[in-house]
A protein has these predicted regions:
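N-terminal Rossmann-like NAD(P)+-binding subdomain of aldehyde/semialdehyde dehydrogenases
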Residues: 2-121
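ALDH superfamily catalytic-core signature
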Residues: 11, 17-19, 214-301
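A generic fold-level signal
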Residues: 88, 123-126, 267
Length: 301
């Protein structure tokens, strides 16, 4: 099996090394595509096996993964990591396993009999091939594994480009992944400087990106060179609108919890609040009181 070289293009010979890692990624993509052509439509049993192996990967290495995430963060509570990264991820895989057979079945569709008399129409779900997944740092396990699971359910292979801020986790996943899944099914790539844009220039069959609008535009422009379809989940400015009749203390509690969870680094977190002018001071007082009780010092959460 070919492996992705761990190259840092910020040191001497950066141009040559950047070209080397681009070539390495292309070789891995070619290998995964050959494997796809040999097995273009995995059976239900194959897909379930891959999903179960993916769940085992995170389930059997929870402690090591939590430690790696904490190293990348500088510090992150293991309880927060358990809640944010593992519970929803494992439950999501279980849900896919439960529904996979139904999702794989062909479905009849209506057809205009005046245009196509005596014809029938059936939609047959088919894998796309090799999916390129670009993952941010804020929920690195949930936003990688949950989307890998979806791609596996659809019969695809996945190449994952992790964030430059998730180096410890990425190295761990690169070490663990081959023990559970073939390298022509799943591979993790570490961001070593400039890899992200080059990654999105590869001729994947689909690119999934989670991150900022500015970077999303660059990813989409790069993907357009190959007419690669993209799925973009981009951060925005999410409001919280408080009805004047709603319990103001409860609203403040829920909003402040969301703003403090994961240090507020959530794609759809509340960015601003719309509150009746007459209630503004009271709302601020409730927010301040919540913070003093739950986060009395900067390192107390």
């Amino acid at each position: 099996m070919n492996s992705i070289a761990d190259i840092n293009p910020t040191i001497a010979g950066s141009i040559e090394q950047a070209e080397a890692i681009r070539g390495s990624m292309q070789m891995k993509l070619d290998e995964m595509r050959r494997a796809y052509h040999q097995d273009p439509n995995p059976s239900e049993a194959e897909r379930k096996h891959h999903l179960k192996q993916l769940k085992k990967l995170i389930g059997e290495n929870t402690e090591a993964i939590s430690k790696a995430i904490s190293e990348d963060y500088g510090h992150r509570s293991e309880h927060e990591t358990m809640f944010a990264e593992f519970i929803g991820t494992g439950g999501g895989i279980d849900d896919i396993l439960k529904n996979l057979r139904k999702w794989m079945k062909p479905e009849k569709r209506h057809i205009d009999s005046t245009m196509f008399p005596f014809a029938s129409n059936t939609v047959i779900p088919q894998p796309l091939g090799v999916v390129g997944l670009i993952v941010p740092w804020n929920f690195p396990v949930f936003l990688s594994v949950s989307q890998i699971a979806i791609a596996f359910a659809a019969g695809n292979r996945v190449m994952v480009k992790m964030s430059e801020n998730s180096r410890s986790l990425t190295r761990l996943l690169r070490e663990l992944s081959p023990k559970y899944l073939p390298e022509d099914k799943l591979v993790f790539i570490e961001e070593t400087g400039g890899v992200g844009i080059e990654f999105s220039k590869l001729a994947f069959d689909l690119i999934i990106f989670t991150g900022s609008g500015a970077t999303g535009r660059k990813v989409m422009a790069s993907a357009a060179e190959n007419l690669t379809p993209v799925i973009l989940e981009l951060g925005g400015k999410s409001p919280a609108i408080i009805d004047p009749d709603y319990d103001l203390a409860k609203a403040a509690e829920r909003i402040m919890f969301a703003k403090q969870f994961n240090a507020g680094q959530i794609c759809v977190n509340v960015d601003y609040v719309m509150v009746h002018k007459s209630q503004l001071d009271e709302f601020i007082d409730h927010c301040t009181a919540w913070l003093k009780t739950n986060v009395p010092t900067i390192n107390s959460d």
